Amino acid sequence: MTDTAADSANLPDTGQFFQRGNYAPVPDELTEYDLPVKGAIPAELDGWYLRNGPNPRQPTGHWFLGDGMLHGVRIEGGAAKWYRNRWVRTDSFDTPFGVYNGDGSRNLRSAVANTHIVNHAGKTLALVESSLPYEVTKDLETVGCYDFGGKLNDAMTAHPKICPTTGELHFFGYGNLFSPHVSYHRVDAAGELTISRPIDVEALTMMHDFAMTSGHVIFLDLPIVFNIDIAVSGSGDMPFRWEDEYGARLGVLRRDDPFGEVRWFDIDPCYIFHVANAYDDGETIVLQAVRYAELWRKDGGFGDSAVLWNWRIDLRTGTVTEHQLDDRAVEFPRIDDRLAGLPARYAVSVGDASLVRYDLRTGDAVEHRFGTPDAPGGPGEAVFIPSPSGAPDESNGWYMAYVYDPVDNASELVILDAADFAGEPVARVQLPRRVPYGFHGNWISS
């Protein structure tokens, strides 16, 4: 296998996993045109594939805390026009300043903006849950901090939900040291922030994601709780730890009564980084997510694995039933975004050197594997791109993901036919450098 050190940032080695292999940051920004392709890019694809992730310029104490870097490929006319990577130049990029002030208030412009990139109402936003979003162009240049015309006074989750029916953007913020620790917000299809309200929870917990249905939003109040001792220790680690006594619960708010009561439902203790989907089934809410039985009890590491899980919230009886859907360790679940909050049939997650496509209706699953047993490939999160022609079906389109090849120390943008998920990729765009493992991305159609 090829050594990654030659194209990695020259940072002091502190022994953390995210300094090595394809987790290691790249040292600079590139732009390359007319990328070579193996196979044939579908002519219908016209847009930008953009993905966010950490790429620290200085040593950090945790993978989640590196400076955000966007990696993008422009696809048009059956060709890969360009690849480029750019750091998100936040207000704290050149002159770092802390998230919290001495009095406990927050600097919402202090950001690494390293987690997700979404497009809504003509704005492309780089997101991290500790700050305001940062607007970027589709060419990956940073425009600046974006606060919805001065209306947003809280951080914005990196996992907002766009309603496919109304075009509204739903999101929450968290991070206040003092109550209220959580807030809920809604932006209309034109990009105007129309609703902001507090959500009462007992403590500052790490609420990374939430869920949306056609009639509800669901908050995840789980036992990863802010730890002030870690925060002031100077370790640079994530200042959250598992607390048994906190418990776990799901909070349900009706979308047609956004300032109404949040109903809380106790569940078995667990942690959820990422929701696959949720939907209404009569007087029951179905929630599908990747579940950790326990996380961060001793440190902020990733020794525990997660599996796909199902919860059914009965709004009539106030009870929740739950069960495991599969025993494979997976993360980063995605669905066809046209079905967000509706009964989607398929969810695709990152597995062990594979992408796993779950049939949520039948319980079946199919894998697309990368590399060989001796040199397994490394796929990232897969995004579904629906075909602009033909039936609006979850199998009529393509999945895109960056995939790392450890033999050549190189990355490709792989395009899979959704109707032949386990088959050969329809196209593999050869990238001019490896793309470090990161977090989330999106396809933005032209």
Language model segments and positions:
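Beta-propeller domains
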Residues: 1-446
